[in-house]
Amino acid sequence: MKASEIRKAFLDFFAQRGHSVVKSSSVIPHDDPSLLFTNAGMVQFKRTFLGEEKRPYNRAATSQKCMRAGGKHNDLENVGRTARHHTFFEMLGNFSFGDYFKEDAVEYAWRFLTEDMGLPREKLYATIHEGDSEMRLGPDEEARGFWARYLPADRILTFPTKDNFWSMGDTGPCGPCSEILIDQGAHVGCGKPDCRPGCDCDRFLELWNLVFMQFNRKEDGTMEPLPKPSIDTGMGLERVAAVIQKVPSNYDTDLFAPMRAKIAELSGYRYGTDPEKDVSVKVIADHGRAAAFLIGDGALPSNEGRGYVLRRVLRRALRHGRFLGLDRPFLSEVAVAVMESMQDAYPELLESRNFITRVILNEEERFNETLDNGLRLLQNEIRRLRDEGAGTIPGALIFKLYDTYGFPIDIITDMARDLDFKVDEAGFADLMEKQKEQSRMHWKGSGEREVSEAYRQLSAEGVSTRFVGYDTLSAQSTIAALVRDGQAVEEAPAGTDVEVVTSETPFYGAAGGQVGDQGVIVGPSSRVIVSDTLKLPGDLIVHVGKVESGRLRVGETVRLEVDQALRGDTALHHTATHLLHSVLRRVLGDHVKQAGSMVAPDRLRFDFTHFAAISRDELAEIERLVNEQIRVNRDLQVREMNLDEALKTGAMALFEEKYGDRVRMVEIPGFSRELCGGTHTHRTGDIGLFVVTQEMSIASGVRRIEALAGRRALDYLGRQQSVLHQAAGLLKAGPFEVAERVEKLLANQKQMEKELEALKSSLTSKRSADLLEQAEEVGGVKVLVMRVEADDPKALREMNDRFKERLSSGVTVLGAHQGDKAFLLVGVTPDLTSRVHAGNLIKEIVKTIGGSGGGRPDMAQAGGNRPEKLQDALDLARKLLRERL
């Protein structure tokens, strides 16, 4: 049975039992700041389990895209080395939100595995929670009883909390687990006579985990039974496919066959003939899948957070490609094999094919360049270490090459061996462990606001806010809750900061890149200045403000009034953003995708994918086309419809947004169509004017445009014109002559700088000739030890070069100081390096000025922070040279 058939059979099985088949959420959990990646099927239902979000169904089934690389769940280093570890995988799961519980969950799992999948009943085991005295919980006898309907007692095993109890955090929903295992036979395992379920080998393979969410763990650790227990299950598709297809590893399933075939075609290597090269094939296949799905869901390579993990995944695959002889870009072709093989389940991959392959190819080219730079650095450092007499490559250098340049450790080790160098493996391992710890502790999430317990409680009680701000900027409503410092309160006196929740509001809560509204809330005896508005999960809109006067109370009827001018300016910028997005795709190409945005009353910022700097002509064309659409003055059309219906119209859905079944489509007829919950103008002509103020690169393959619309754009052009006229006045030229006049001034300045450098060089040459007359002879060798005037080490080097031009044979030791810094330089002509080593000499004298340094046999530099000891250092150099010459 193919993996695609297993996936379909699973979803069909649960659909027939009243489950809603829910589409996989993004592998990037944009609405959960606690997670780096979606790592389990329950992630998209987390707020439902917490009672913060209601769904139109109470049982669901999914095949969820998951990623485990970075953060707490990190399988990256094990990938390719084991039969089961992956960075990207699919998790099959069924869920109950207060509907069925243990009895049905056990029955469904048993029937699917034994009847639909045909797994042998006599090979299956089940585990249950053995209980926990600290949690005051006994063994899960209820689950044991249900399993006893299908399994003999000796194949129902108890395991401790660390294996068979699941919790969402230190507090909140939690409960015991049951795992289903299959005995694959003694030939698969470790061969030990006492091998049994729980052994680390693959004989007793964990297939399916059933979590019985039946408790709410309180802050004091007590377990309170949930009023509506729930079910969360997970089974890896790759793992169950390996069992059903009777292959030794997940990588031998049909899921990975297209990638293995493509790698064989590109490299000429036949999988299964060399264990070490097989590891590389597995790594490339796995990482190619991960990269395709990550980029498809909106991740881009960068040096932090999710983008950094993606970059590491890509570069790890590329390094393994080199082990197979793949020196040219190849991973984008493996990614195409992924997309084509997964198109039935994930058609969105093929839709983004050009974009995904372009991102990967761009990163491959950058990596090859980086690898070349790293190779040069390694060669230079080995040369320096040899000159200094060192025999070991430091761990810090290895780590820099590995972390900064993505340099393969094997290449470093091989080069070291060829040159009779050792490698500081312990130092490198220590730095790697520190990096892993920092990755676990300090990864950057999605930046979403954490929801306080007060709001979780409100959601659980069914409190929500109805937004009426599309149609009106003022409304009357009732105060449903007041929150101060994360705690719900009954009232808020004058002068206090407060967060206000009402039953309905015209205030737009920050979402989709648009900032929250500002305005006032007026009560019977109070007035609140609203400085921001937030949209929280569970349809809660929170007004953040300060009580200006009076006392605000829960239950009061209040008047909510949005600042009309600010809302209007925000609307202009939001509609302008839609125009800009559409124009960018027309001018630059369909590969342009939104990578982030900010829409405010005073400006807009739009981040998008593009792989080259935007030329001045392109930028002018972008600005012209946006303004052309403004002048056309098109009517905006806003419609609500089903998500599938909207997508069929070609509406653009943004990967960072989470959409419900009903969506709002904003259309500028004939020009733009996007899913958007923000506020807009009625006609494009309302924008008036659009001006780009800045364009820049913010990451590899990501550009940013900042722009102004409406009166803000007009103000900007007015200020710009004022500055232009001021500059024209200073230059005594007309406004249109300013650029030409500045070009002439810059050309004159450049010529004068060249003349100045020539004069300096002439003076230095003359000074060098004068100083050279003061050289003394020591043992038949000309030696110049002197304190000179030089602003920095570079000037000192230039002076030394002048001496070398005039000295056919000799040694120079020069010293200079600038402020609280002292500089030393030792130069030795090639014929004398066997008698005087510049690097060794400078190490001996630099200690005098409280510094350090080194260098080659013929030239070395050093610096220190005790300039008052400079003459002592020079005297020591003179003394040492007399002894050695």
Curated annotation (Swiss-Prot):
Note on cofactor: Binds 1 zinc ion per subunit.
Cellular component, GO annotation: cytosol
Keywords noted in UniProt: Aminoacyl-tRNA synthetase, ATP-binding, Cytoplasm, Ligase, Metal-binding, Nucleotide-binding, Protein biosynthesis, RNA-binding, tRNA-binding, Zinc
Compartmental location: Cytoplasm
UniProt-annotated binding residues for Zn(2+): H574, H578, C676, H680
InterPro entries: aa-tRNA-synth_II/BPL/LPL (IPR045864), Ala-tRNA-lgiase_IIc (IPR002318), Ala-tRNA-ligase_IIc_anticod-bd (IPR018162), Ala-tRNA-synth_IIc_core (IPR018165), Ala-tRNA-synth_IIc_N (IPR018164), Ala-tRNA_ligase (IPR050058), Ala_tRNA_ligase_euk/bac (IPR023033), DHHA1_dom (IPR003156)
Catalytic activity: tRNA(Ala) + L-alanine + ATP = L-alanyl-tRNA(Ala) + AMP + diphosphate
GO molecular function, a single term: zinc ion binding
Cofactor dependency: Zn(2+)
Top-level lineage group: Bacteria
Pfam families documented for this protein: DHHA1, tRNA-synt_2c, tRNA_SAD
Known EC number: 6.1.1.7
GO biological process, one term: negative regulation of DNA-templated transcription
NCBIfam families for this protein: alaS (TIGR00344)
Function in brief: Catalyzes the attachment of alanine to tRNA(Ala) in a two-step reaction: alanine is first activated by ATP to form Ala-AMP and then transferred to the acceptor end of tRNA(Ala). Also edits incorrectly charged Ser-tRNA(Ala) and Gly-tRNA(Ala) via its editing domain.
Family: Belongs to the class-II aminoacyl-tRNA synthetase family.
PANTHER family assigned: ALANINE--TRNA LIGASE, CYTOPLASMIC, ALANYL-TRNA SYNTHETASE
Domain notes: Consists of three domains; the N-terminal catalytic domain, the editing domain and the C-terminal C-Ala domain. The editing domain removes incorrectly charged amino acids, while the C-Ala domain, along with tRNA(Ala), serves as a bridge to cooperatively bring together the editing and aminoacylation centers thus stimulating deacylation of misacylated tRNAs.
Protein name stated in the entry: Alanine--tRNA ligase
Source species of the chain: Syntrophobacter fumaroxidans (strain DSM 10017 / MPOB)
